[in-house]
């Protein structure tokens, strides 16, 4: 029986890549800088002391970081027994965004350039804005700028509630984001607006990767909160992923937990499970692992590392999240059968000590564990697509165009 379980710790980079200078990210190191802050006692907010990740360390995390950067993260045990196979992987894709990272993991790197809204003020073309106002019958719009999602709610949330004007904003990523209040504007209305925006961006040739619905609740600035009803409308991958091949060639099953289905525009996904927060995502993953049959992938994205702590530059929060993940990791490992493989990885970096609020161009960890997986180093991987090619070989699908099987 062949089953694979892929866990993406969204944004969990392990050191800047060789081409980081092109992105302004030389020296970025999500894991290393979190560990350094913890070791210095600078991340003692609800948790305390050095970063404590014994289970991830046993799977090779500290060694993968050493391969990427040349050193073991502060406070982590470089001499611990390693029971898994580990690697550090470079991104072939042209960006450092979520779709590029995930698609490349599944064997389809993004070799074209995404479109971006690079102006920090008046970010969107007037023609696009006019079409959205007309088609969605809007009273106008707010924002039209680059912003952090939480900052813009404090700035414009109250005005949005009074006027009914949606908040449009973007970032350094290829995204068009729309924030609206779940109660005063309505969730269904927000989703419909996002569908219209997706159509206009596609038809207009803007080449924008994602439209993201950002619903929130609350009654005034300072207590607005984004909810778990986020929805991403992505373009489809430019070629069949290993997920699609498993479904088409092996009549397999691919279970999305969290936002995976959105990232792949539902391509190659046979079941979608919604969950919000690390514990709920873990619980849903465990349930699906227990029910998984032959030729099945259970694919989970743990988005909180990125959205709650990476972008918000919350070192202590990120550290606490990693420690929670590590504590629960044995629950996943205990469910593995003889031929199963568990892959822990990431899609990009988002160093919470870095300037700004955007992603960072970093190597990702590739930690592989299973009863039949030989422990030890798998070395430096030239592309995330090595994961996809490994899965193609494991399940016996046709080869992917990119990547080399790791074993």
UniProtKB/Swiss-Prot annotation:
Its main location: cytoplasm. Its EC number is 5.4.2.7. It is found in: Cytoplasm. SUPFAM superfamilies: Alkaline phosphatase-like, DeoB insert domain-like. It comes from the Bacteria. Keywords: Cytoplasm, Isomerase, Manganese, Metal-binding. GO terms for cellular component: cytosol. One of its GO terms (biological process) is 5-phosphoribose 1-diphosphate biosynthetic process. It catalyses: 2-deoxy-alpha-D-ribose 1-phosphate = 2-deoxy-D-ribose 5-phosphate; alpha-D-ribose 1-phosphate = D-ribose 5-phosphate. GO terms for molecular function: magnesium ion binding; manganese ion binding; phosphopentomutase activity. Mn(2+) 2 binds at residues 306, 311, 359. Mn(2+) 1 binds at residues 10, 347-348. Isomerase that catalyzes the conversion of deoxy-ribose 1-phosphate (dRib-1-P) and ribose 1-phosphate (Rib-1-P) to deoxy-ribose 5-phosphate (dRib-5-P) and ribose 5-phosphate (Rib-5-P), respectively. Belongs to the phosphopentomutase family. This is Phosphopentomutase. The gene is deoB.
């Amino acid at each position: 029986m062949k089953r694979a379980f892929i866990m993406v710790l969204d944004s969990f980079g392990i050191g800047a890549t060789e081409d980081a200078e092109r992105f302004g990210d030389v020296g970025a190191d999500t894991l290393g800088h979190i560990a350094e802050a913890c070791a210095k006692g600078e991340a003692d907010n609800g948790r305390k002391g050095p970063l404590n990740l014994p289970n991830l360390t046993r799977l090779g995390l500290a060694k993968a970081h050493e391969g990427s950067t040349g050193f073991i993260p502060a406070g982590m045990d470089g001499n611990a027994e390693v029971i898994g196979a580990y690697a550090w992987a470079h991104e072939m894709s042209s960006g450092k965004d979520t779709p590029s990272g995930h698609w490349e993991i599944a064997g389809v790197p993004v070799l074209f350039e995404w479109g971006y809204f690079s102006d920090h003020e008046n970010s969107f073309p007037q023609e696009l804005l006019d079409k959205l106002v007309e088609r969605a019958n809007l009273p106008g719009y707010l924002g039209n700028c680059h912003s952090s999602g939480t900052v813009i709610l404090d700035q414009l949330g109250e005005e949005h509630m009074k006027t009914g004007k949606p908040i449009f904003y973007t970032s350094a990523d290829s995204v068009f984001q729309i924030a609206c209040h779940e109660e005063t504007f309505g969730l269904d209305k927000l989703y419909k607006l996002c569908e219209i925006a997706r159509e206009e961006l596609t038809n207009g040739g803007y080449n924008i990767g994602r439209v993201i619905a950002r619903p929130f609740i609350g009654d005034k600035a300072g207590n607005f909160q984004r909810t778990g009803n986020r929805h991403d409308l992505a373009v489809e991958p430019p070629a069949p992923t290993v997920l699609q091949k498993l479904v088409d060639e092996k009549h397999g099953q691919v279970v999305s937990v969290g936002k995976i289905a959105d990232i792949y525009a539902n391509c190659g996904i046979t079941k979608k499970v919604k969950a919000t927060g690390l514990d709920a995502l873990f619980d849903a993953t465990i349930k699906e692992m227990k029910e998984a049959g032959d030729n099945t992938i259970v694919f989970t994205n743990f988005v909180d590392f990125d959205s709650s702590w990476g972008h918000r530059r919350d070192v202590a929060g990120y550290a606490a999240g990693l420690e929670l993940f590590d504590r629960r990791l044995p629950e996943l490992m205990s469910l593995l059968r003889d031929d199963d493989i568990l892959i822990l990885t990431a899609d990009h970096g988002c160093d919470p000590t870095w300037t700004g609020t955007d992603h960072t161009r970093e190597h990702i960890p590739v930690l592989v564990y299973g009863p039949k997986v030989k422990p030890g180093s798998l070395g430096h991987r030239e592309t995330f697509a090595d994961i996809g090619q490994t899965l193609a070989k494991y399940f016996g699908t046709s080869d992917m165009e990119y990547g080399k099987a790791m074993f």
